[in-house]
Amino acid sequence: MTNPQSPSPALALLLSSRRLGLVLSGGSARCSFQVGVLETLLELGVRPALCIAVSGGVWNGAALAAGTVHRLRRYWRAFMRMPYLDVGNLLREHSPYRFSEIHRRTFSRYVGVERLRRPEALPLLIGVTRLRDRQAVYCDARTAADPLTLLLASNYLPPFYTHAPVIDGERYGDGGLADNLPYPRAFAEGCDAVVLVTMKGESEGPPYRGPQDPDHLIPPRFQERMVVIRPRHRLSASFVERRWPVLLQTMDLGRLRAREVILGESHPETDVQAEAGALISILSRLLLTRVLAAGRRPHPPG
C-alpha cells in the first residue's frame, strides 16, 4: 500500500472523501482497462463507499463489491478461454453466441452471489435500461432476488444476447443505453467525490455517455469533485477483443494510467497510439452507436 507523505491533489481528494463513489462505464472487452485501475486504487488505499456500474463494467464492479479483485485477471482469462460460438445454440437461444452461459459459469466461480450478500460487501448499484420507456434504473446487487440476472440485464444487447431479462415483470437492457456515465447518480447517493473510469481515449474527444451524447462535457460543478481515469488514446483492444495478450496489455495500461492520473507519475507506455485494428475499432463503435440509437426510438402506438 502506498501512502505518500505529501499526496497529490487527486489522491488527497480521494483519501479525504467522507463518501467516495466509483463509477465504472461500459465498453465490453475494453473494460479490461478497469481491472488495472481497480488494482491500483486498492494498492493506494483508496476504498470507495459505493460503486455504480453499467454494461461491461458490472463484472468488475461485482468483483470489487465481493472483495475478489485479486481474482479478476483469472476471471477474465477463464471467460476468454471458453468457446463463445455454438451453432446448436441457434436452436435454444436463437443466437450462435454463448455469452450468457459463459458469464453464469465464470461469475459463480470467481465472484459468487453469496459474497455479494455478505454484510461487508460494498454497495453496488447496477444501471439497467427499462426497455418500455428507455429510462435508467439502478438496483442494488446485494439485495436483488437474482443478482446474476441483474448483471446480465445490464449487458443485454442483440445479437450477443437474444432474450431481454425480465425482473419483477419488467424487461431490461444494456445499462449504457440510458447512461454510460452515471456519475450524477453517485452524487445523488450522497458521495462527495467520485472516481469515473471510462474507456474512450482522451485524444478521441470527451467521454462517451450515450448515442445522444457521444462527446459528453462534465459540468464544472462536478469536475472539481471528480477524478476521471481514461486512456490517453483509443485502446488497441476492440469491443469484442478475445486475444489474451491484448487484454492483458490493456489491464496493465489501466494500472499505469491510474498512477498517472492519481499520483502525477509519467509513463511513456500510456502515450502509444493504437495501430492494429483501427478500422475494425471505428466500425465497431459506429455499429454499436447505431444499435443503441435505434433502441432509443419510441415505439409506434398500438
Describe the function of each predicted region.
Residues 1-54, 62-302:
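Patatin-like phospholipase
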